[in-house]
């Protein structure tokens, strides 16, 4: 009985957190309304599994990156650790953003939004990183900045 209750409680907590990601990605306007066409919004429910994977991957990847730097004896907060003028943390997140950089036509944006279980690259970066506190620290993001999201609105699943 106790384990069933624990499983049910865990499932409810997971569903609540997952719904938070659904709402965040569904709130993104992919394409504005045009003529008789309504605005095209992200489909957070359809892309949920991949959005959760991106969140978990970012967290695990960043932890692994920091651990590898420490094992090499690198002080990631030192001036000597700068990479082309960026801190190691900044370089990590910039590389994530570069991975998903794309230039696509509106019709392809529409096709991908409707038929692909992955969010568009821009949203994989911008929505995901707004849930990652170390990203805020790396770039000094604060209230009022475009990428700011209050801690109580950040979704942390894994």
How would you label these PLM feature ranges?
Residues 3-158:
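Zinc-dependent metallohydrolase catalytic domains
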